[in-house]
């Protein structure tokens, strides 16, 4: 089976259109006929699909018409015109889509010798900043065309489809089609799904698509000589799994002509390293007699997956839950009759996909929207301003500079140069949405109006060039303050005045200067007196700030200690954590992600907290970097990663035994307790979770990640009203509903961590009857069976009294009412008792095996267990 669909088959086939479904709407469909004149549209006769012009979705390109011949009148109508791109390297269609929506994206290419050169066009096709495929539009036959199709979840509300010139031939395209799919269909563990085939098994020669197929999948007929086709006119009902195969597809099927032989379907991947998914469609379409049975084994590459009996006149879809690799790139699905079956195996249809990874993150969505609004406002026609503004780097927009940390972090725009660009009108307000901008150059244009105050809100902005325009008025006070306090350099024409500044008379200058000298002298003497008083006091403490030089590093030093960010330890909402060395000692370096909108606030909070608090169970801050938008935190290195890695088995090696889990819980509780009662003012962590509990060389536990921490008032009824922050599954429901933050919010989160350590269950697991761990634990507790709750990786190496006490404590911590939860002092005390009970039992039972273990879990709301 060829891995690339030839659209000649589609063009030559007659589409099957069922009159009963002609009323299907095309909501969410995008159907572009590339090259169609502006404002024109039509209904394609073979599919009833409405096609519109592509003019509003592309900035460049020229239109062409295929050469007429005897077959022209029979081909797919969107093939008759096309758009080609003789100018520029990258030309991109920009489509408005719904972020997070799963789409079937189809691009169609039909050469038709439009240029009279008989030259096969070859070029690359990109989806956003990532390569999708290489296109080779064959010219061997005038009917040949190529379709490239993919199932993809959109990352933003803008989708860029780009044609990239790779040689001497000119990229071209005939049509673009987008069809929204149901969110829970065609799900890959990672990446997107590149279509290889949609086959239905029949001896017909008709292709089937919309309106019979509500998703507009194009089903091609397929058969093999050793197969026999069967069909029915009876309606086959669909199953609610969302795949909705058309009646014309599911009413036909193939069986092996030799009833004792298997039904085998084989396909080839482009590379032996590729991964694939197969979707098999089954429905029993024969009326079986009482003594007839159809049951068969489904094997993939020789591995027996399931014994299956098709449902009578009801369609079901089966697929491999994990991607399949095939030896030598040759994949095989085989249906073999079981011993008790009287009938041969049957299959109605199959869809084949290969997995394609799109690793490069798109540029920050808000900044893409902003830069495109700027482009629209000023009618900029720069040919490079298409697609993603930052990546791939070789296609970045002229005049735009970006900070690209790694492929998993969205790039940020840090410099915009629009000098000598013929700009007119006022300075665009969209510029303020480029929140990481360091330099802005709008010089030598025809801009009018005043210098806008919003420029002062762009915190990283260091240089602004506005000379050579027709601006008027004065520099806003906020910008003058930035010049004075932050070192901002603002270049404006002489007619732009500074507010509050006048030319004083010479005698006034002399008087003011004299008074100033006296005032300065007095202030200096007062400051010296105050400083000496403070220095002599042993009870007063100087609060550390971000200006402490002994722990502040330059960004170049951060790069040096991480060997230019060579080894990644992990990633989180703040950014990427790298391994490094400082004075021959290992350190962990957390670098702020440019995409974090509250990154600097959290960074500052964490530095200020860790500079003033010290506890054996809080991770130590070695230093920090605060250099423009380059922010980093340098911590002590924790050799054994975080708790969740060990509970989930991602660290490999031996698992944590029961006593180790209790010790880790105790030490974590002591760290939280110190924040609650040992700090002045007291602090709430707000993001207690298993990934924020780090483990040292000897598995000593330390709490980390203080970016969300907040101070709180002391008192039983005291709370802080604040926006909700934290991690789903660990959030205190009372905090979530009322925005009331207290130390009991940390207690709730710790209860979830404790429940993870006890049960070995994920916090949220959709495959469970009860998705959330608390609900699951409550249902298990109703049976009073401790073994059904405890992590099976513990292999029953725990004491029931110790484990019950720990479980009851966890459920108490996650009580819906914060007033019913214990404080962290009591939690630490109770956990110590759990460990003492366990150790006492071990001493009394020296012959027990001490197997090690591992676990994972978390959830929302629950009650104290009553079963025992």
From Swiss-Prot:
| Binding of ATP, residues | 569-577, 590
Which residues are exposed on the Extracellular face of the membrane?
24-510
User: What residues bear Phosphoserine in this entry?
Assistant: 721
Active site residues of this protein: 687
| Molecular functions (GO terms) | ATP binding; protein serine kinase activity; protein serine/threonine kinase activity
Q: Transmembrane ranges? A: 511-531
State the name under which the record lists this protein: Leucine-rich repeat receptor-like serine/threonine-protein kinase At2g14510
């Amino acid at each position: 089976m060829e891995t690339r669909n030839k659209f000649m088959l589609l063009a030559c086939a007659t589409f099957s259109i069922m009159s009963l479904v002609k009323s299907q709407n095309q909501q969410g469909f995008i159907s572009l006929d590339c090259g169609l004149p502006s404002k024109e549209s039509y209904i394609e006769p073979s599919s009833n699909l409405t096609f519109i012009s592509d003019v509003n979705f592309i900035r460049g390109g020229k239109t062409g018409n295929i050469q007429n011949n005897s077959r022209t009148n029979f081909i797919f109508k969107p093939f008759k015109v096309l758009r080609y791109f003789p100018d520029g390297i990258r030309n991109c269609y920009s489509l408005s889509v719904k972020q997070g929506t799963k789409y079937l994206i189809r691009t169609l290419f039909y050469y038709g010798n439009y240029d009279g050169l008989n030259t096969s066009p070859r070029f690359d096709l990109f989806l956003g900043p990532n390569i999708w495929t290489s296109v080779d539009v064959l010219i061997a036959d005038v009917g040949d065309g190529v379709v490239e199709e993919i199932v993809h979840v959109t990352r933003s509300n803008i989708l860029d489809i780009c044609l990239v010139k790779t040689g001497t031939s000119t990229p071209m395209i005939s049509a673009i089609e987008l069809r929204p799919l149901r969110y829970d269909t065609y799900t890959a563990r990672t990446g997107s799904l590149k279509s290889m085939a949609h086959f239905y098994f029949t001896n017909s020669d008709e292709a089937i698509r919309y309106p019979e197929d509500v998703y507009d999948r194009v089903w091609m007929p397929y058969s093999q000589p050793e197969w026999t086709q069967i069909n029915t006119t009876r309606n086959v009902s669909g199953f609610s799994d969302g795949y909705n195969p058309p009646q014309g597809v599911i009413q036909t099927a193939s069986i092996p002509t030799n009833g004792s032989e298997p039904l085998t379907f084989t396909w080839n991947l482009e590379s032996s390293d590729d991964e694939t998914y197969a979707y098999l469609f089954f429905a029993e379409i024969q009326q079986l007699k009482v003594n007839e049975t159809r049951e068969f084994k489904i094997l993939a590459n020789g591995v027996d997956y399931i014994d299956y009996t098709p449902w009578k006149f009801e369609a079901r879809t089966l697929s491999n839950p994990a991607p399949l690799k095939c030896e030598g790139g040759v994949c095989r699905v085989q249906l073999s009759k079981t011993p008790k079956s009287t009938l041969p195996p049957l299959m109605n249809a199959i869809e084949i996909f290969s997995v394609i990874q799109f690793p490069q993150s798109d540029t920050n969505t808000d900044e893409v929207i902003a830069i495109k609004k700027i482009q629209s406002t000023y009618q900029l026609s720069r040919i490079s301003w298409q697609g993603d503004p930052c990546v791939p780097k070789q296609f970045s927009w002229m005049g735009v500079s970006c900070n690209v940390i790694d492929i998993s972090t969205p790039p940020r725009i840090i410099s915009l140069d629009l000098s000598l660009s013929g700009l007119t009108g006022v300075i665009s307000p969209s510029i303020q949405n480029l929140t990481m901008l360091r330099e802005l150059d709008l010089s030598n244009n025809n801009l009018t109006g005043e210098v806008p105050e919003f420029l002062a809100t762009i915190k990283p902005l260091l240089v602004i060039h506005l000379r050579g325009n027709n601006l008027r008025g004065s520099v806003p006070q906020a910008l003058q303050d930035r010049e004075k306090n932050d070192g901002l350099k603002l270049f404006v024409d002489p007619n732009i005045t500074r507010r509050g500044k006048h030319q004083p008379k010479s005698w006034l200058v002399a008087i003011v200067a004299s008074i100033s000298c006296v005032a300065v002298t007095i202030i200096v003497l007062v400051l010296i007196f105050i400083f000496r008083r403070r220095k002599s006091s042993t009870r007063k403490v100087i609060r550390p700030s971000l200006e402490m030089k002994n722990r502040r590093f330059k960004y170049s030093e951060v790069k040096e200690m991480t060997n230019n960010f060579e080894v990644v330890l992990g990633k989180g909402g703040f950014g990427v954590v790298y391994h490094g060395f400082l004075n021959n000692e290992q350190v962990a370096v957390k670098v702020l992600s440019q995409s974090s909108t509250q990154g600097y606030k959290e960074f500052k909070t964490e530095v200020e907290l860790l500079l003033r608090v010290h506890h054996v169970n809080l991770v130590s801050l070695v230093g920090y970097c605060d250099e423009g938008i380059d922010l980093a935190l340098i911590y002590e290195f924790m050799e054994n990663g975080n708790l969740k890695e060990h509970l989930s088995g991602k660290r490999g090696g031996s698992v944590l035994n029961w006593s180790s889990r209790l010790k880790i819980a105790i030490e974590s509780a002591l760290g939280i307790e110190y924040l609650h009662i040992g700090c002045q003012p007291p602090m709430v962590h707000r993001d207690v979770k298993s990934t924020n509990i780090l483990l040292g060389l000897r598995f000593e536990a330390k709490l980390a990640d203080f970016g969300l921490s907040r101070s709180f008032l002391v008192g039983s009824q005291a709370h802080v009203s604040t926006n909700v922050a934290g991690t789903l599954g660990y959030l205190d429901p009372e905090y979530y509903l009322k925005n009331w933050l207290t130390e009991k919010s940390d207690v709730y989160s710790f209860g979830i961590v404790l429940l993870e350590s006890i049960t070995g269950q994920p916090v949220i697991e959709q495959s469970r009857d009860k998705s959330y761990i608390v609900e699951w634990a409550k249902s298990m507790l109703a049976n009073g069976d401790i073994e059904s709750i405890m992590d099976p990786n513990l292999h029953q190496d725990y004491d029931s009294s110790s484990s019950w006490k720990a479980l009851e404590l966890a459920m108490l911590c996650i009580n819906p009412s914060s007033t019913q939860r214990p404080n962290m002092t009591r939690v630490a005390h109770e956990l110590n008792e759990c460990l003492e009970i366990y150790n006492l039992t071990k001493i009394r039972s020296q012959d027990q095996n001490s197997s090690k273990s591992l676990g994972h879990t978390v959830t929302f709301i629950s009650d104290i267990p009553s079963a025992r």
